[in-house]
């Protein structure tokens, strides 16, 4: 499939916490869509190995959330490092989107970009400097159209691939109900 500069790359990461100076990436997934949000390709879901000391140092929320989802055990069993995961994602994305063309798409993606900058800098540079952050529309709906805001039932599973599809669905919802285009 030929790369297309109008496609959008959706990314989500799960991390051991929120501070990229202390925490690390434990899961990352990508999905490529057309501009109209039709899915073109689902990338690999990559679980990144991190040492037990880092996993043990997670706060209670992260231990509980990633424990219930089974992610902690997957991280312990993984042999994939951040550099390997980055390379796999770059190879996948190069098949679908030219470098530097797609904004980084997702929910609260400035957080993902901070972790990419620290631990996957080549992947961070693959994206255009712009972001397509669904949370912007969510915040506008909360303030300007509360009924629209309350109309989207967010599951927040905190699993990278599921969260991407939920972000795409949420943008479709806001496109129809808030933007009305």
Curated annotation (Swiss-Prot):
SMART domains: EXOIII. It is found in: Cytoplasm. The active site is at residue 129. Pfam families: RNase_T (PF00929). Belongs to the oligoribonuclease family. GO terms for cellular component: cytoplasm. One of its GO terms (molecular function) is nucleic acid binding. GO terms for biological process: DNA metabolic process. Residues 8-171 form the Exonuclease domain. Keywords: Cytoplasm, Exonuclease, Hydrolase, Nuclease. Its main location: cytoplasm. Its EC number is 3.1.15.-. This is Oligoribonuclease. It is an enzyme of class 3 (hydrolase). It comes from the Bacteria. PANTHER family: OLIGORIBONUCLEASE, MITOCHONDRIAL (PTHR11046:SF0). 3'-to-5' exoribonuclease specific for small oligoribonucleotides. It comes from Bordetella pertussis (strain Tohama I / ATCC BAA-589 / NCTC 13251).
